[in-house]
């Protein structure tokens, strides 16, 4: 029997990854062929990022593998941020089958984060 809320650190590492320019293709684009991948563009100095990130992580973990999350520090990965035309953070994009399918900028309330993750999962079939 599988119980909710009993995930291990290994489970978390499989679902939520820190991604950089050298791993973006594998961890986001290629991984999105199997399940949608939500990409959180953030920076350590960004106040709203500090509340959005953990809220997104909680929803991704609650989805039990139906979606994954990649976290990208824009200060350390400026090339990806430029390619994605990130103008402000936090910025979130969802990828499926290698393409961005949804996204938003700025912090959202918990109900909208939950709805966003549900939309992404639904888009991924």
Q: Over which residues does each language-model region extend?
A:
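Proteins that catalyze or organize thiol-disulfide redox chemistry
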Residues: 1-65, 78-79, 83-85, 89-91, ...
């Amino acid at each position: 029997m599988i119980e909710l809320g009993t995930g291990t650190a290994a489970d978390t590492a499989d679902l939520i990854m820190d991604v950089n320019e050298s791993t973006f293709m594998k961890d986001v684009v290629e991984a999105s062929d199997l399940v949608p991948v939500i990409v959180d563009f953030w920076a350590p100095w960004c106040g709203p990022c500090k509340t959005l990130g953990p809220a997104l992580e909680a929803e991704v973990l609650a989805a039990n593998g139906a979606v994954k999350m990649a976290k990208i520090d824009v200060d350390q990965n400026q090339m990806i941020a430029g390619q994605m035309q990130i103008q402000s953070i936090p910025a979130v994009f969802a990828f499926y089958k290698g393409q961005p399918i949804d996204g938003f900028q700025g912090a959202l309330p918990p109900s909208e984060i939950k709805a966003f993750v549900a939309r992404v999962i639904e888009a991924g079939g």
